[in-house]
A protein has these predicted regions:
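Long, intrinsically disordered, charge-dense linkers/tails
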Residues: 1-124
Length: 124
């Protein structure tokens, strides 16, 4: 369910969202599709070719990560769908940063502020 929600939220930003068989601690990571150029080569091409578009990557989700497990629990309540999708978008942004890529800073900052506001409103 969480994988489907993340895939819907990300739309065409990634080639695929799939379960990771290799991650043990991280919640997610971005990997290149088989046969595609390395991320480093794509970054170099993008710097030298203004209209170069990065190839879509695969977002691998670790189903055993505590955040992903909690998202799966929350998914049983449809009222949580928006929150789960926002978490999926943030996981993708986190994975982009870990891969040395730049996510949309304005969207990420707004999302993080919303998360912080939700947490702050739960404090006494």
């Amino acid at each position: 369910m969480v994988l489907q929600d993340d895939a819907l939220a990300l739309g065409d930003q990634v080639q695929e969202v799939r379960r990771s068989e290799r991650l043990t601690e991280s919640a997610c990571c971005l990997v290149n599709a088989q046969g595609s150029m390395s991320t480093t080569l794509q970054r170099v091409l993008r710097m030298n070719t203004p209209d170069f578009e990065m190839q879509k990557m695969i977002l691998e989700i670790n189903p055993n990560a505590s955040l992903v497990r909690r998202m799966a629990e929350l998914a049983s309540n449809p009222d949580n769908n928006r929150f789960i999708q926002e978490c999926g978008l943030q996981l993708h942004a986190n994975a982009m940063i870990m891969a040395g890529l730049a996510p949309n800073g304005n969207e990420m900052a707004a999302r993080l502020q919303d998360f912080m506001l939700q947490l702050a409103s739960q404090k006494a």
